[in-house]
Amino acid sequence: MQKAEKMQELRVFAQEIRVETLKTVGSLGFGHVPGAMSVIDALAVLYGEVMKVDPKNPHWEDRDWCVLSKGHAGPAMYATLGLKGFYPVEEAYTLNQPHTNFPSHTDRTKTPGVDLTTGSLGQGMSTATGAALGNKLDGRDNHVFVFVGDGECDEGQVWEAAQFAAHYKLDNLICFVDDNKYQLDGAVDKVMSHGKGIGAKFDAFGWNVIELQDGNDVEQIYDAVQLAYDTKGKP
């Protein structure tokens, strides 16, 4: 298949995820819509083209991992996994209801395909880093992808993990920073400015930083992941 055809398929997949995300949140009547919507194109690229996963065997040891450190984007992950066949997508319409397998924040003990329970911001980044190190020590040829919010980057734990990942040369770890400019209490720059930018901080720790002009463009996201794959010795 030509690249242009692949990209068009990913755009369609992203639109399908958007629709299902809105249905999922709508079933509850409220939820984290913007924080879910802002990661959908990246999820479409990962699950539509990039990641090694098996819906029939969610715990396959050689799978790629995807961690939502910003766990409140759970509805987007549920829509993505449902469309990939991990479960009937309509099951997610029980979002945050009693006895549901789809809490508002992702939970690996409840939802097939979810690799890590998240919600307390910063901890997903740290655990994803540990998973990447563990996979490397075990000799697995896989990657760990982690989504971190720009507001989440106020957490010191994010930067401890960033330093750790660079020190141990975890080139099997790829971090997406969802730089959507807003967090719960308002504009990110008003709550806690990151000086020269979040990318500059990761660069200072020794990461290979790739900044996109449009984080909702599936082709730019796909190309960035390929560049990250080609980088050796740096997360």
Language-model-detected regions and their locations in the chain:
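Thiamine diphosphate
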Residues: 1-145, 211
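Glycine-rich ThDP/TPP pyrophosphate-binding loop and its adjacent helix/strand module
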Residues: 52-59, 63-65, 105-235
